[in-house]
Amino acid sequence: MPLPLSFKKEGTIERHQVEGMDPSDRSFSRSILVNRVAQGYTGSVMYEALTVTGSIKPTIGAAVFSVVEKLQEFGFTRIRTRPNFKGQRYLAEKETWVDYPDKP
């Protein structure tokens, strides 16, 4: 039986759906994997040949935002995210989207 998330020391603990437009102005949808590490949380996403890993942050939300910021640096726009899995539990797409304003 797996440990509850509050006891899990390291590894993937959440998956967040990320959607938006890629630098070629094509829509995309991927998963940001949020991992617990010794110093906090970090997120990562793969898009075609690109792997983006955010900085280590103290909260899950900050870890997701770190990935979004890096995607924006690569030219991704109209980005929004929402949690889809907490551990093994599917959230049935009931969570609210978080929209991120484009960089000027």
Question: Residue locations for each model-derived region?
Answer:
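Short, surface-exposed linear segments at secondary-structure transitions and domain or protein termini
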Residues: G61-E69
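Alpha-helix capping and helix-coil boundary motifs
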Residues: L3, T59, T77-R78
